Amino acid sequence: MVLIRVLANLLILQLSYAQKSSELVIGGDECNINEHRSLALVYITSGFLCGGTLINQQWVLTAAHCDRGNMLIFFDVHSLKGLNKDVQSRVAKEKFICPNRKKDDEKDKDIMLIKLDSPVSNSEHIAPLSLPSNPPSVGSVCRIMGWGAITSPNVTLPGVPHCANINILDYEVCRKAYTGLPATSRTLCAGILEGGKDSCKGDSGGPLICNGQFQGIVSWGAHPCGQSLKPGVYTKVFDYTEWIQSILAGNADATCPP
């Protein structure tokens, strides 16, 4: 009953944002149901929506700015308009955010680990995505996915996850696009220089997958989404692998890299 009620609320949320529009998704298409096995839908009871990535049977990685109180995490969700009998739902038992994260800057160290109240079971449409063994190189083709907006600035939420291919860009592209970025950063700059492909509202916390490896977490970007010379900024997962492994090993006091 809880699952039915929550998915009904998600549908209401999706319909409440919908605008009459013939525009296509921001550079992407509906994901193949077999390509988002690690994608988690992170739902907060207030209606706030994020994505996440299953990294093993009991842990999900998402963005720290998605931390909004009580969380329900769903797996094997495709359409928000209909119940899939194989959907698995879990409660966030514990949440871990970098202890050295700047409290007044939600863009800083935008990464959060969620421990589920019980492990999920692998299935045809549920499987974890392993952490990266190396960082991505500039020019790498990467996949973004999520239930986020398919039009911007007028928001239309699609009700099914959409996927698009973007590229890893030189960090200097983002420094030119957004004032105030530091000279070095534990983030990835990714997008299409001419615009038209981008993550957007509701995609936060979802994965950036490059050559089959989980390389980034959707963090922030320009509004409206998909502007030329305004790529997205993604948390660089590779730089946090030691912290992630420490938390998974039981070291709750582990500190993130500066």
UniProtKB/Swiss-Prot annotation:
The active site is at H65 (charge relay system), D110 (charge relay system), S204 (charge relay system). GO terms for biological process: proteolysis. The keyword Repeat does not apply. Residues 25-249 form the Peptidase S1 domain. Glycans are attached at N154. Its EC number is 3.4.21.-. It is found in: Secreted. Expressed by the venom gland. One of its GO terms (molecular function) is toxin activity. It is an enzyme of class 3 (hydrolase). Disulfide bonds join C31-C163, C50-C66, C98-C256, C142-C210, C174-C189, C200-C225. Keywords: Disulfide bond, Glycoprotein, Hemostasis impairing toxin, Hydrolase, Protease, Secreted, Serine protease, Signal, Toxin. It comes from the Eukaryota. Residues 1-18 form the signal peptide. GO terms for cellular component: extracellular region; secretory granule. Residues 19-24 form a propeptide. Snake venom serine protease that may act in the hemostasis system of the prey. Monomer. This is Snake venom serine protease. It comes from Lachesis stenophrys (Central American bushmaster).
